[in-house]
């Protein structure tokens, strides 16, 4: 691996049982420079968010690294029937640019839809896709795409707030209420934003 901030991890894909490698960022290479109000983090050097979506090159299974190995046999069967038959083998290992990271995240999002995942899981991937478009501000169409995925994330966070038990991932009720208010603010709906912020 060319970039010494990266390293490879070997594991077994929980969907197809193939031995695969995924790329991770060394923790010492992650130096935070700033944070946005919706928890988007900026780094001085390499950005670990580019590597958080892992992909099996053999079957097309993709998920956030923290959840990648949490796949039941029933879910694995859904991957085999809903994704693998249409998958063209390709590797996402090694150094990634934003375009490749976006592709990995969108594949993870598609996997979640096939698995009929919880709203909170969908929200987590959607907001990260929005952040990647924000980081990629050199692309003239990125702002529209950012807002599109912020809106998707918002819809899923609201559904999660209404239907899931707290904590939702790492979010307690106050944090979830805050992120909903903040996302409403970012997409230009101050009335709804204030309504949610007033609950805190």
Predicted features and spans:
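Structural motif corresponding to the intra-repeat A-B loop/turn of tetratricopeptide repeats
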Residues: 136, 140-143, 147, 187
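TPR/TPR-like (Sel1-like) alpha-helical repeat modules
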Residues: 154, 158, 190-200
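Flexible helix-coil transition and linker loops at the boundaries of alpha-helical arrays
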Residues: 93-94, 108-124, 139, 158-170
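N-terminal cysteine/histidine-rich coordination modules
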Residues: 1-81
């Amino acid at each position: 691996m060319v970039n010494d901030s990266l390293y490879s991890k070997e594991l077994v894909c929980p969907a197809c049982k193939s031995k695969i490698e995924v790329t991770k960022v060394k923790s010492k290479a992650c130096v935070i420079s700033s944070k946005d109000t919706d928890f988007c983090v900026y780094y001085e050097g390499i950005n670990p968010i580019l590597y958080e979506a892992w992909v099996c090159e053999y079957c097309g299974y993709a998920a956030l690294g923290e959840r990648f190995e949490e796949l039941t046999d029933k879910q694995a069967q859904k991957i085999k029937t809903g994704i693998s038959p249409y998958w063209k083998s390709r590797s996402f290992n090694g150094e990634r640019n934003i375009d490749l990271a976006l592709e990995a995240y969108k594949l993870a999002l598609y996997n979640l839809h096939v698995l009929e995942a919880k709203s909170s899981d969908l929200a987590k991937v959607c907001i990260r896709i929005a952040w990647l478009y924000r980081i990629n501000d050199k692309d003239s169409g990125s702002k529209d795409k950012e807002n599109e995925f912020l809106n998707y994330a918002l819809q899923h966070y609201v559904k999660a707030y209404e239907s899931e038990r707290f904590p939702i991932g790492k979010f307690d009720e106050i944090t979830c209420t805050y992120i909903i208010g903040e996302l409403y603010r970012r997409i230009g709906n101050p009335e709804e934003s204030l309504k949610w912020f007033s609950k805190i």
